[in-house]
Amino acid sequence: MKQIIKLAAAAAFGAIAAGSIVYAQASPPPPPRAIVSVYHAVPGHQEALLNWLAQQDRVAAAAGVAPMQLYAHTDGDSWDYMGIGPVTTEAQDDAMDAAARRMGLQTGPRAGLELRKHIQSHTDTFTVGPMTATQLLQRLGS
């Protein structure tokens, strides 16, 4: 009889303990973020633009930031280059500015003026990805 009472007490304690535990659902990690940039070069400035972008890759590497992945236009729309790069933190931006200064390069608005010598226009679009269509549907709860 003592054994049954002990088992019943243990079962009751287990039920009470299990009912009081809050189970946290692991939320999915946030999706990766990126900036997609599309550049229209000034006619005759394609090589100069590529040199400027290569400088930015060296700055990023010196700051420990992943470089932009560049795609060159071959047929179709009017853009020349499309880049996909990481969304940086303020600390990464500061590290890149410091690296650029050490290399003797412009920072801040002056860096933007240097870029604009070689482009007719550009766009920057903040995105999430890369992800599959299935992953995007999961984010929608579908």
Residue ranges and their predicted role:
Residues 20-24:
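Sec/Tat signal peptide C-region and signal peptidase I cleavage site
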Residues 26-29, 57-70, 76, 86-132, ...:
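An amphipathic, aromatic/His-enriched active-site/gating alpha helix that lines ligand/cofactor pockets
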Residues 33-38, 48-50, 81-84:
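Short, structured motif recognition centered on aromatic/hydrophobic residues
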Residues 38-43, 85-89:
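Short beta-strand-to-loop capping motifs
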Residues 48-55, 95:
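Extracytoplasmic/secreted proteins, especially bacterial periplasmic and envelope-associated proteins
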